[in-house]
Regions:
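Short internal beta-strands
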Residues: 33-41, 119-121
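Glycine-rich phosphate/pyrophosphate-binding loop and the adjoining helix
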Residues: 152-189
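Conserved small/polar residues in nucleotide/adenosyl-binding loops
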Residues: 210-215, 227
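Glycine/threonine-rich flexible loop motifs
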Residues: 91-102, 127-130, 200-207
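Short glycine-rich anion-binding loops that position phosphate/pyrophosphate groups of nucleotides
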Residues: 14-15, 65, 89-94, 123-125, ...
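Short, acidic/small-residue loops that bind anionic groups at enzyme active sites
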Residues: 97-124
Length: 227
């Protein structure tokens, strides 16, 4: 479902920004085109040159860059993509999204779009648990923003708890669930697996203990149909 799709990847200014490099690779493996946008803080953790080299696309950074605006204005940039992914989504960026603040290119893009948005929060556990952040989460969910994570684990600061950015593979999976719009959308399928028992008479049966990969294959194949 990613072939021919255009992903606008907004990279926030957090230590988890390094994961965005792997995220770009994962999207490309699926056939997607990744157009990167970096906040000023993101450039402190990963270089725009690295992001441009991996994505094979220009990195957009500045709202008031005349060259960027002449090539593709921020309005068109926000609307020419099939999905906007914010990873990492810092507490600051989430707060801007919740209250409609458009103070830089990233936040302006997010305010000027009607494209589906998926965010992957990443911050210190205390920042994530703070009432202000939790209120922002509620606002964003109410506004239709999709979430991937955060996950629980060790922090770069040495603390433990929720606030780790989801792994790139998990973000790609969440993105695929948003993009698919197949004929079985909103339909539920029950997939069973394990050994089978087939009776041959009232007292005997044939048992197959081997579990093939078929159930897993069926589970993966149902995704393009949105079931």
């Amino acid at each position: 479902m990613f072939h021919g799709r255009r992903i606008l990847l907004i990279i926030g200014g957090g230590i988890a920004a390094y994961k965005s490099l792997q995220l770009i690779r994962e999207f490309q493996k699926k056939g997607a085109t990744v157009v990167p946008v970096m906040t000023r803080g993101a450039a402190e953790f990963v270089t725009p040159l690295s992001v441009a080299a991996l994505s094979k696309n220009k990195v957009f950074k500045d709202l008031f860059d005349l060259n960027d605006e002449s090539e593709m204005g921020h309005i068109e940039l926000s609307r020419s993509s099939d999905l906007i992914v914010v990873a990492p989504a810092t507490a600051n960026l989430m707060a801007k999204m919740a209250f409609g603040v458009a103070s830089d290119l990233a936040s302006t893009l997010l305010l000027a779009t009607d494209t589906p948005v998926l965010i992957a929060p990443a911050m210190n556990v205390r920042m994530w648990e703070h009432p202000a952040t939790q209120n922002n989460v509620k606002i964003l969910m109410k506004n239709g923003i999709h979430f991937s994570g955060p996950e629980e684990g060790d922090m770069a600061c040495g603390e433990f708890g929720f606030g780790r950015m989801s792994e790139p593979e998990a973000i790609v999976k969440a993105a695929s669930e948003i993009l698919i719009n197949g004929p079985l959308r909103n339909k539920h399928i029950l997939i069973t697996s394990g050994p089978t028992h087939e009776p041959i008479d009232p007292v005997r049966y044939i048992c197959l203990l081997y579990t093939s990969p078929s159930p897993r294959d069926v589970e993966e194949s149902r995704m393009p149909s949105s079931a």
